[in-house]
Amino acid sequence: YLPDFFGVYDNLKVSEYMDFYGSMYRMTSREITAVSNDLLELVNLSDKKEVYVDTLSRGMKQRLCVARALIHNPSLLVLDEPNSGLDPRSRKDFQLLLQRLAREDYTILISSHILSELADLCTSIGVINGGVMVQQGKLENIMLAIDSSNPLRITVLNQVPKALELLRQDPQVSRLSVDENKIAAWFSG
């Protein structure tokens, strides 16, 4: 499990941090060393083993916490808002890491309120509102359902035909409806 806000032991080196968590799962020293080396390689932190955790950037700490979460080879990796607080470059690096984990057959459950961040990662999603699953399925089907249920509503003071002409030129507009001076536009992207 990787929470949205994660704590790290700042006074530990990266290798000590991994040793600590490996020992929590009753792994032997040999197992911890082997698995830690593989995981730190996976998250691109091999060169940081002897660096104190508090000197790592937020993105590096995030990747370290993924390595920590994987140390016992879980069948499910749960991530809560994994891109929270990351700069754009770190977000991209983290997304590449998650794609790599998915290719290695990890099952990953991600909690996020930013659907666009999930587009390249997920095979299916569920939308929860007020603690209730309101939609679930393939991302493209969910996006179509959301798009079709939430048109952009425009009130035009004059020149409705001109407004319609402009909207029809947009390749993202999938459907339009007109009621006097009110236009509803649905988008496909």
Model-derived regions, located:
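ABC transporter nucleotide-binding domain
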Residues: 95-187
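Conserved catalytic motifs of ABC-family nucleotide-binding domains
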Residues: 73
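Conserved ABC ATPase signature
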Residues: 52-56
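Short loop immediately C-terminal to the Walker-B catalytic DE motif
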Residues: 83-84
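Conserved ABC ATPase "signature" region
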Residues: 19, 23, 30-48
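Hydrophobic anchor residue at the start of the ABC signature
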Residues: 66
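Catalytic Walker B motif of ABC-type/P-loop ATPase nucleotide-binding domains
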Residues: 77-80
